[in-house]
């Protein structure tokens, strides 16, 4: 049983709070106190709207991730999903990966409970093939490759944008499967403090607090501060080999600060900071009953960014940013420590001339890995150009980019997308693109590494059909993404290790069809997505590990009397736990129920 209580002064927009009642040993009820000022703006009879777990974005929403420039969703050809804070709260998720798993085209795998290593597969692609940003700050590990999802504190995230499909022509290395951007809260209006407290099964305790708002003349200075603490005794996670009969609990602490200053109508400064610490238990496969130990993983993440945005004229704007992130992973008592530092510099230029949009960017990325005995670094310098057109029924987006790596030289990528509105509310889309990922410093310079490894490269093509009107929408996207020079762990012989080495030996293909939709029928809002995919190794014909050929999410909510009720089911087919396809992981289904009612002017029961 988990009973959190939140005291919150919400934003002036329509307030939505939900928490799911999951069919597992954890039932969640929330009593939320909202400010009298916000309550006066809404009558008692007004329904509290549920933010669905996979909200279909409105065409009026603006998106940054597709082109690195803020654009209305209606102007984009890209396949994008948006998750807002209300949706995050409604999900009842304990981690970011659980929220993402509800979105079209995404499935996850996890090695144990909260705090243990997780993988996020975007359209079936390797977890390292997704570029991840927090407030524009790149998050990556030069040891394992890709973001360490368990390090990212969900309590500090206000909005998520997911771009499906290769985007290396915009973002450079890593964006073979897509891009996920995370945004922290941004202050506006009067000061709005909030406090949340929760207790639950498995000895779980949570507390969070923060404040956001704006001050100064016309709110020129805005701020948002937040902190959260979570502790759980966990459960006994079982692994192969000897079983350690302990509970693998976790402790996490996180905080964030976001400050903004509008110098005048044309210039603005922003600064962001996020930090998190996670201490989680796990079971080592080499556990011995005669010498029991409590194995722990210690995760630390810090991101910081400073940016200046300038609107020089009605048609020309620039943005300059400096970003920094530190990703640290350690295990005890088994001695292992790896730390990745990333530094980024970006000068973005945008021109708008009628229906035409032009962009030009210079970018530098510096990577550093400390993983004894490795002490290595590298840099990438890039020039990116983009062109967009939105006129009448036609939408065009073109991007090219050249990356110069200090280790392996230059790499060119490009993408072209076209959308045609052939009827009212309908649009057909087509796109092609290339992408790459540079091998990590660990892949090249560890005892298992090979210095001559080449970047993994991909070619993608996709077709889409979309419909959107009022509260109903539908989309279907068919894609095929082929990767060459795939880096895999093979037998010994080309490196110093006798256990095996990394090598460019494999080819992979990620192909499939994603259906997604939302429909309002007789007072019931339906939503869902179905993915049919075939992620496979082209050399062996085997299905790629830990990815199912079918997975889906279906849900509905409605209002009955004074209650808003909802239900959701997530289902996934069988997968394999190894590349040889000999260890089968069975399919599963997860059911969620949630409900909401206002019991007094200032109280909502969830």
Task: Report residues per predicted region.
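Conserved C-terminal beta-signal and adjacent last beta-strands/turns
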Residues: 6, 10, 26-27, 212-216, ...
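N-terminal Sec signal peptide and the immediately downstream disordered periplasmic leader
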Residues: 1-103, 261, 519
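Gram-negative outer-membrane beta-barrel transporters
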Residues: 387-395, 480-482, 502-579
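Short acidic/polar hinge/loop motifs at secondary-structure boundaries
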Residues: 137-164
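Periplasmic-side early beta-strands and strand-to-turn transitions of outer-membrane beta-barrels
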Residues: 168-169, 181, 188-190, 196-198, ...
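Outer-membrane beta-barrel signature, preferentially recognizing the C-terminal barrel domain
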Residues: 288-311, 341, 406-409, 421, ...
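Extracytoplasmic beta-strand/coil segments of soluble accessory domains associated
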Residues: 97, 101-137, 158
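Face-selective signature of the C-terminal outer-membrane beta-barrel domain
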Residues: 260-278, 295-421, 472-478, 520, ...
């Amino acid at each position: 049983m988990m009973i959190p209580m939140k005291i919150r002064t919400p934003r002036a927009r329509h307030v939505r709070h939900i928490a799911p009642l999951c069919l597992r040993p954890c039932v969640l009820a929330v009593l939320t106190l909202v400010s009298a000022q916000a309550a006066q703006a809404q009558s008692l009879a007004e329904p509290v709207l549920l933010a669905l777990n996979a909200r279909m974005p409105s065409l009026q929403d603006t998106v940054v991730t597709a082109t690195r420039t803020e654009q209305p969703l209606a102007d984009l050809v890209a396949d994008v999903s948006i998750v807002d804070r209300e949706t995050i709260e409604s999900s009842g998720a304990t981690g970011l990966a659980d929220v993402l798993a509800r979105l079209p085209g995404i499935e996850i795998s996890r090695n144990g409970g909260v705090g243990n290593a997780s993988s996020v597969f975007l359209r079936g692609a390797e977890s390292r093939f997704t570029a991840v940003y927090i407030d524009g700050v790149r998050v990556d590990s030069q040891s394992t490759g890709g973001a360490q999802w368990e390090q990212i504190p969900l309590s500090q995230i206000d909005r998520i944008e997911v771009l499906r499909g290769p985007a290396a022509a915009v973002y450079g290395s890593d964006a073979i499967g897509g891009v996920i951007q995370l945004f922290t809260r941004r202050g506006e209006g009067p000061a709005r403090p909030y406090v949340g407290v929760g207790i639950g099964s498995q000895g779980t305790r949570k507390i969070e607090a923060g404040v956001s708002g704006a001050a100064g003349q016309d709110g020129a200075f805005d701020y948002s501060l937040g902190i959260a603490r979570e502790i759980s005794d966990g459960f006994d996670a079982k692994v192969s080999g000897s079983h350690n009969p302990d509970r693998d609990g976790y402790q996490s602490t996180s905080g964030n600060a976001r400050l903004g200053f509008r110098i005048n109508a044309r210039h603005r400064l922003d600064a962001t900071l996020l930090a998190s610490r996670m201490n989680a238990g796990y079971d080592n496969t080499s556990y011995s009953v005669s010498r029991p130990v409590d194995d722990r993983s210690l995760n630390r993440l810090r991101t910081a960014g400073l940016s200046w945005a300038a609107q020089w004229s009605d048609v020309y704007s620039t943005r300059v940013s400096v970003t920094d992130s530190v990703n640290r992973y350690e295990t005890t008592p088994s001695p292992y420590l790896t730390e990745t530092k990333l530094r980024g510099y970006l000068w973005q230029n945008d021109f708008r001339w009628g229906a035409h949009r032009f962009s030009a960017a210079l970018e530098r990325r510096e990577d550093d890995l400390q993983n004894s005995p490795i002490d290595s670094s590298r840099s990438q310098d890039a020039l990116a150009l983009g062109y967009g057109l939105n006129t009448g029924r036609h939408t065009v987006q073109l991007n090219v980019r050249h990356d110069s790596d200090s280790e392996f030289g230059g790499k060119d990528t490009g993408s072209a997308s076209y959308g045609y509105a052939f009827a009212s509310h309908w649009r057909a889309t087509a796109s092609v693109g290339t992408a790459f990922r540079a091998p990590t410093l660990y892949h090249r310079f560890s005892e298992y590494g090979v210095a001559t490894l080449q970047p993994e490269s991909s070619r993608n093509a996709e077709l889409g059909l979309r419909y959107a009107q009022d509260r109903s929408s539908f989309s279907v996207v068919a894609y095929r993404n082929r990767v060459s020079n795939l880096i895999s762990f093979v037998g010994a012989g080309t490196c110093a290790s006798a256990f095996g080495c990394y090598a460019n030996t494999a080819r992979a293909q990620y192909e499939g069809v994603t259906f997604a939709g939302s429909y309002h029928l007789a007072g019931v809002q339906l939503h869902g997505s179905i993915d049919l995919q075939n992620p496979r190794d082209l050399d062996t014909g085997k299905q790629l590990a830990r990815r199912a050929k079918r997975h889906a999410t279906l849900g509905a909510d409605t209002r009955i009397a004074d209650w808003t009720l909802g239900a959701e089911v997530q289902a996934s087919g069988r997968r394999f736990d190894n590349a040889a396809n000999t260890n089968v992981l069975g399919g599963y289904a997860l059911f969620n129920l949630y409900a909401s009612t206002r019991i007094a002017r200032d109280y909502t029961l969830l």
